């Protein structure tokens, strides 16, 4: 009579052991999976610390409070994978403060070859005598790209190595044919590499789609300005999952040389997305009369050239205020020097609302952005008010123009990072050493690598499952 009961107890005990082993294995699998996601990366954040004092834009980073604020090391990646002129800046150092009425953001990055003297093409277009590097872009086509001149296009002309030839230029890469617009100009280097002169947005889209875009061409005398930008997300989808921009035409639905472009270059990929962008440009907004050609000719004090009804107060450095959404990229002023203006009237002073100061020393750019926390009501549709208690999603980009980065060819954060105004003092951080061929500096650094929000959600779900598994194990073995 006891044997069946003993067998039943044995089976019950074995069932417990089996269930326990399965749950334990599941628990370990979850832990191993979570181990592959560094916990320091699950909540990327830029704290903006409360300080007493103002920005010193004449000497960025020199204000006494900066020495108490830790650097945050933000990883950057190539905007165009595999392009040799994309992703040249691997990390960006950032720290931020607020003083009750202004937010001040300090950036620093390694730049072995500063783009001194290069015009911003948009600024150069306002000044007819402009000369020197940066007046327009030149594209290096993918090695192996060839060309022919199709003579049956009798109304077309092409320019090859300075010679005007009747016929239409057709590019060929691995059997993919791309007929070029009328009056297309190319230079063929001695090694067969093709350099395309000028680059309207639609052309860049077509070249990129057909695998012919290799990068922007530079040499010792032709290059582009350096840039740094901060994107402030203002869209309806929270949190945003993408900070990328479309490559496309100049306006939505643009018809160019027989091709219609649905997307506009610079418009946001994120559905429901919108953002304000602060763009510093060494060849237009630096306020350095020696190396910034726009300030050298006093461009921003000349309303007859800029088309603006106001001038740059005190001729200080600034960041171009941009606004982008799913439709287009815009400029938050009335002239539309870089992009289409958001409106044709009002917005007095908006182009120079964000102040900047910049220095280049020992192989590093240091750029300081300063902006009032509150914006005028006329700006509020395109610029965020920044307040305590709110989380902001920001992204960063850097261009090294001397090395070929310009326009959509840049180094970017792979996702948005959170930014908040805080009232607590900075936390202690590990001291790290930044080394390069030209400078060695010891500074406090917190490393932040942006990861997709989906990874964060998976991590949280995994932790919850692990806790539930432990509870089940406890209940099973307690019985």
From Swiss-Prot:
**Where's it mainly located?**
membrane
Q: Name one Pfam family in it.
A: EB_dh
Glycosylated positions are: 73, 99, 152, 172, 182, 191, 219, 262, 288, 302, 325, 348, 385
What topology in the membrane does the UniProt record assign?
Answer: Multi-pass membrane protein
Task: State the source organism's domain of life.
Answer: Archaea
List locations, semicolon-separated: Cell membrane
- Transmembrane regions: 19-39, 456-476
One CC-aspect GO term: plasma membrane
Q: Which UniProt keywords apply?
A: Cell membrane, Electron transport, Glycoprotein, Heme, Iron, Membrane, Metal-binding, Transmembrane, Transmembrane helix, Transport
A GO BP entry: electron transport chain
Q: What does this protein do?
A: Monoheme cytochrome whose physiological function is not yet clear.
What is the name attached to this protein's record? Answer: Cytochrome b558/566 subunit A
What high-level taxonomic lineage is stated for the organism? Archaea, Thermoproteota, Thermoprotei, Sulfolobales, Sulfolobaceae
């Amino acid at each position: 009579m006891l044997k069946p009961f003993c067998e039943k107890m044995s089976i019950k005990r074995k069932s417990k052991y089996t269930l326990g082993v399965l749950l334990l294995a599941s628990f370990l699998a979850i832990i191993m999976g979570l181990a592959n996601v560094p916990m320091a990366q699950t909540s990327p954040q830029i704290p903006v610390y409360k300080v007493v004092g103002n920005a010193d834009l004449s000497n960025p980073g020199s204000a006494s409070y900066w020495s108490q604020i830790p650097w945050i090391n933000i990883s950057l990646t190539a905007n165009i994978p595999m392009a040799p002129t994309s992703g040249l800046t691997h990390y960006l150092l950032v720290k931020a403060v607020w003083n009750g009425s202004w937010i001040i953001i300090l950036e620093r990055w390694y730049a072995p070859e500063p783009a001194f003297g290069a015009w911003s093409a948009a600024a150069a277009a306002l000044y007819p005598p402009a000369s020197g590097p940066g007046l327009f872009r030149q594209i290096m086509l993918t090695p192996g790209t060839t060309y022919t001149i199709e003579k049956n296009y009798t109304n077309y002309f092409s320019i090859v190595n300075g010679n005007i030839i009747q016929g239409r230029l057709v590019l060929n890469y691995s059997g993919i044919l791309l007929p070029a617009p009328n009056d297309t100009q190319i230079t063929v280097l001695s090694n067969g590499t093709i350099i395309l002169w000028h680059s309207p947005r639609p052309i860049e889209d077509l070249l990129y789609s057909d695998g012919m875009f290799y990068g922007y061409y530079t040499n010792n005398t032709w290059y582009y300005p350096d840039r740094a930008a901060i994107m402030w997300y203002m869209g309806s989808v929270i949190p945003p999952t993408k900070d990328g921009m479309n490559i496309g035409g100049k306006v939505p639905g643009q018809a160019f040389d027989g091709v219609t472009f649905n997307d506009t270059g610079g418009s946001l990929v994120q559905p429901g997305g919108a953002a304000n962008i602060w763009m510093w440009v060494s060849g237009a907004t630096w306020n350095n009369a020696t190396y910034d050609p726009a300030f050298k000719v006093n461009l921003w004090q000349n309303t007859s050239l800029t088309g603006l009804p106001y001038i740059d107060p005190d001729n200080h450095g600034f960041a171009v205020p941009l606004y982008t959404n799913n439709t287009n990229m815009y400029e938050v002023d009335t002239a539309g020097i870089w992009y289409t203006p958001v409106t044709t009237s009002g917005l007095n002073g908006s182009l120079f609302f964000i102040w900047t100061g910049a220095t280049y020393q020992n192989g590093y750019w240091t750029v300081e952005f300063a902006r009032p926390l509150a914006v005028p009501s006329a700006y509020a549709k395109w610029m965020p008010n920044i307040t305590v208690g709110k989380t902001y999603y920001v992204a960063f980009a850097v261009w090294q123009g001397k090395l070929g980065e310009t326009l959509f060819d840049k180094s970017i954060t792979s996702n948005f990072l959170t930014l908040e105004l805080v009232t607590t003092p900075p936390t202690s951080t590990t001291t790290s050493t930044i080394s390069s061929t030209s400078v060695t500096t010891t500074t406090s650094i917190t490393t932040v690598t942006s990861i997709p929000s989906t990874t964060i959600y998976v991590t949280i779900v995994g932790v919850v499952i692990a806790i539930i598994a432990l509870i089940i194990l406890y209940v099973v073995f307690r019985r």
